[in-house]
Design a protein with these regions (language model features):
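A mid-to-C-terminal "edge-of-domain" accessory segment
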Residues: 2-3, 7-9, 256-423, 429, ...
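Hydrophobic faces of well-ordered beta-strands that scaffold small-molecule active sites
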Residues: 5-8, 41-43, 68-74, 100-102, ...
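Conserved, mostly hydrophobic/aromatic
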Residues: 13, 33, 100, 142, ...
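Alpha/beta enzyme core
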Residues: 21-36, 82-113, 118-140, 147-198
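Glycine-rich, positively charged N-terminal anion/phosphate-binding segment
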Residues: 23-27, 41-94
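Alpha-helix-loop-beta-strand connector modules within alpha/beta enzyme cores
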Residues: 52-75, 124-136, 190-205
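Catalytic cores of alpha/beta
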Residues: 88, 212-224
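Conserved small/polar residues in nucleotide/adenosyl-binding loops
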Residues: 502-504
């Protein structure tokens, strides 16, 4: 059975606090979502703001989607306004998308208190808008706002609205759990008789995640025969978010064996999810199902030992099916099997003696405050050192960094680095908003002649922890930093009493 995937990241997902993408970012994210192979991408509300209008105006010219249909979003006509005179309805026409999605009230409480009108007017608003859009050759999706709450409050009113809209011939009628409070068993109880009554009508679902059940509710609806599912990448959305497509897609495809996106496209899920996270500047939770960095990570012990024999012993799917990868962390508790498995991840062949050597070094370093579980790049270099293969890209001679306050206002840091790269000595300076920024600029300045790609590297995460606060200002500090060059992500760790030395 084919399930239509309707992505609403660009509209409902971006109602999340802290997300305010530019038009350029929205266009880039639309291309990424299209690459995933979804059926529909809801671009936004063209009548809502100049930025939304600019997005659709630009999309007409420059957004070439290979898989998805772009959908514009709006609402039913305003109360006491003719549909042909409603500017936000006209904006839907002007967006020139083949598909439009309109939202309308389906709860008696919202009709009487939010709209301050009666059911007949609410039905007229919905019917007029659907009819007008269809007369203008648009294919219409209808988001029935507060549908589940409406059924619980006054089912007669909600079902009357449903019947009126369905009779207008909408492409899909979407049951919306706008407040996100519906439970899975309620989905079955409330929707089953409706789906049976309208066997020829396509239905969809849109669940908010306020009670943590958005994905589960979506799966329950699909089990009833719903063939249209809405959600957002990484679960973005207002309050606690929407049904998360990064969890929903693998569950539908790999667990329920339903047709959603192409298999090869699903294998891009993790990198696409991470790329979108970078564009909106909100890191994915490491423990996020399927796409998190820890989703297929195994710590030393029985799990890691079992994984060295057969991945299926401790993984419910092959990580590569969603573009992720299996990872084994190494800590002071690691055994030789775990170390050898981890080395293979780096394409390094370790003997038992070398594994024993690494374990001893990790134990000693962790006693000093290091922690290698989240610092694969540092662990890789340690393994290379044990193999006698540690690369030397440059040799460090010295550095100096200081900060000063200028004009009684700004504090500026300056750094001087002296390094040798392939027998060429460089003395470079850098000025930044702090010591770390200044050192970073000075070091990049010295390296970019031989390694021009260093300009692509940027800091994406930075964690500082004092190891033993009883030592006061002389305490050792652990710094874990994460970098990316736009394609790969890696982490390194440093421990010292001097913060500047750690950063170098």
């Amino acid at each position: 059975m084919k399930i239509d995937i309707f992505d609403t990241t660009l509209r409902d997902g971006f109602q999340q606090e802290g997300i305010s993408p530019s038009v350029k970012d929205k266009l880039a994210i639309a291309k990424l979502i299209d690459e995933l192979g979804v059926d529909f991408i809801e671009g936004g509300w063209p009548g809502a703001s100049p930025k939304e209008k600019e997005f659709f105006d630009t999309a007409k010219k420059d957004l070439n989607l290979n898989n998805a249909k772009l959908v514009s979003f709006g609402s039913t006509r305003k109360l006491n306004t003719k549909v042909e005179e409603d500017p936000q309805v006209q904006a839907l026409i002007d967006s020139q998308t083949e598909y439009v999605c309109i939202v309308g009230k389906s709860s008696n409480l919202h009709i009487t208190k939010a709209l301050e009108t009666d059911v007949d007017n609410a039905i007229s608003m919905a019917v007029d808008t659907v009819r007008f859009l269809k007369e203008n050759n648009r294919k219409v999706f209808f988001d029935a706002e507060h549908f589940f709450d409406g059924l619980k409050e006054n089912a007669e009113v909600t079902l009357k609205i449903l019947d009126s809209v369905v009779n207008e011939g909408v492409e899909c009628f979407i049951f919306c759990d706008t407040n996100g409070g519906t439970l899975p068993h309620e989905v079955t109880e409330l929707l089953n008789p409706i789906i049976e009554k309208y066997p020829d009508q396509e239905f969809g679902v849109h669940f908010q995640n306020d009670n943590g059940c958005a994905v589960t509710n979506s799966l329950a609806a699909v089990n009833l025969g719903v063939k249209h599912v809405q959600g957002t990448m990484n679960g973005y959305g207002e309050r606690t978010g929407n049904a998360d497509l990064c969890t929903l897609l693998p569950n539908l495809s790999l667990k329920m064996n339903l047709e959603t996106v192409p298999e090869k496209s699903l294998e891009k899920l993790t990198p696409i999810a991470n790329h979108i996270a970078e564009l909106v500047n909100i890191a994915i939770d490491s423990r996020h199902p399927y796409v998190g960095s820890s989703a297929f990570t195994h710590k030393a012990g029985l799990h890691a030992s079992g994984m060295s024999k057969d991945n299926t012993l401790y993984e419910h799917i092959n990580a590569s099916q969603v573009g992720n990868y299996t990872r084994t962390t190494v800590s002071e508790l690691a055994g030789r099997a775990s170390v050898i498995t981890k080395a293979k991840e780096f394409n390094i062949e370790f003997s038992n003696d070398e594994a024993k050597n690494l374990i001893e070094q990790v134990q000693n370093l962790e006693y000093e405050g290091f922690q290698y579980e989240a610092a694969d790049a540092s662990l890789y270099l340690l393994m290379k050192k044990i193999k006698g293969e540690e690369p030397e890209f440059f040799s460090f001679e010295s550095f100096r960094v200081y900060s000063e306050r200028r004009n009684s206002q700004n504090v500026v840091s300056e750094a001087v680095c002296k390094i040798t790269v392939e027998e060429n000595r460089f003395v470079t300076t850098g000025e930044g908003v702090g010591p770390v920024d200044a050192l970073n600029k000075a070091l990049k300045s010295a390296l970019k002649n031989n390694y021009p790609d260093v300009d692509k590297i940027k800091l994406t995460d930075y964690k500082v922890r004092i190891i033993d606060s009883s030592d006061g200002t002389e305490a050792k500090t652990r710094v874990l930093v994460e970098f990316t060059d736009g394609e790969m992500i890696w982490s390194t760790i440093g421990v010292h009493e001097n913060l500047s030395l750690i950063h170098i």
